[in-house]
Structures are given as C-alpha cells and as structure tokens.
C-alpha cells in the first residue's frame, strides 16, 4: 500500500470516529502507549486480484502497470472506562456507505468492500483487575497498485536501402 493511501485511511478513520489524528496510530510504531481513546491500524493480506494491466504513460517508452489490489485493515479501538468500543466501531463501519465518504474514497482511489464482524476484546488488565474496554474489526478495501517501468522497447524502426534494381525503399513501423 502506498503512503498516500495510508495517510488517507488514517485521517479518514480519525475523522469518522471524531478523534484527533494523534489518537490514531499505525500498529507496531515505536513509542509509548498513548492515552485513551486510542485507535491502532494494521494493514495486512495485501494481494493483487489479477494480472497487471500495462498502459503507456505520457512519457515516451514508459508504461504504468496497474493492478487491482485488495487488503485488510485491522482497526482496534481502546476506550476509556465506561465506554463501549464495539459501538464506536459499529458506527465507523456504517459510515463508509455515506455519500460524502463514498466521494472521499473515490477521489482517493480507494473502495471500501466490507467489514468482518466486530470483536469485543474487553479484558482484565494486570493485578488491579481493571477492565480495558477494547474492540477490533477488519475492514476490507481495494485500490489500484501502480508500478511505472521503462522496459526499453523499440517503438520505431526505420530501414533505408536499395534493391538490386536500384529501387529506393523505406520501411517504418
């Protein structure tokens, strides 16, 4: 997944959940655990759905290889005491169908496909026997992965010569 797609998803999820952008982080980043509410994101299972479609670009000899690609985005919501992270994620899942959000995703070249069932991961922490309200959901998305290449193909060939009977000829391809 490219950086622009990551940034778009990060910022959109923060907006849809009504959180500051600093409260949404990519999983496995170095640093300390932030104050709740906190959302972690992890993208995995990225897979091309078909062979790449090779299209010429505006630059001579350059081609863009475009592949429709699916991936899963795990969203974990760590809530405050007395909150219900399952409800927050349920709201997040429903919002991907809003016309304004659909416009945003289309402009970013991303499509929301579906969400797996939300899991309530609330559990006891440490010896204090305090509950940590937490829930997770896997969101499935599609985007077009693009790789640009200049394979060095010969686009044009000109051959000039003479035949035994002195006939001039030119071949262009």
Predicted segments with their positions:
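Acidic-leaning, charged glycine-interspersed low-complexity segments
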Residues: 97-147
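Oligomerization/assembly interface segments of phage tail-like spikes and tubes
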Residues: 65-81, 90-92, 133-143
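Small/polar-rich, solvent-exposed N-terminal microdomains that initiate assembly or binding
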Residues: 1-60, 155, 159-173
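Short beta-strand/turn micro-motifs at beta-sheet edges
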Residues: 57-65, 126
């Amino acid at each position: 997944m490219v950086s622009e797609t990551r940034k778009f998803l990060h910022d959109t999820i923060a907006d849809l959940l009504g959180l500051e952008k600093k409260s949404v982080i990519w999983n496995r980043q170095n640093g300390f655990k932030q104050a709740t509410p906190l959302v972690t994101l992890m993208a995995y299972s990225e897979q091309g759905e078909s062979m790449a479609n090779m299209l010429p670009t505006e630059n001579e000899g350059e081609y863009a290889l475009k592949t429709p690609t699916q991936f899963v985005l795990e969203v974990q919501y760590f809530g405050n005491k007395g909150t219900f992270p399952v409800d927050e994620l349920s709201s997040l899942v429903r919002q991907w169908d809003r016309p304004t959000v659909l416009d945003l995703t289309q402009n970013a070249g991303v499509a929301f496909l579906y969400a797996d069932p939300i899991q309530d991961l609330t559990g006891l922490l440490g010896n204090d026997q305090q509950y940590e309200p937490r829930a997770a959901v896997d969101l499935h998305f599609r985007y077009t992965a693009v790789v640009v290449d200049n394979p060095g193909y010969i686009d044009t060939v000109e051959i000039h010569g003479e035949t035994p009977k002195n006939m001039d000829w030119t071949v262009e391809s």
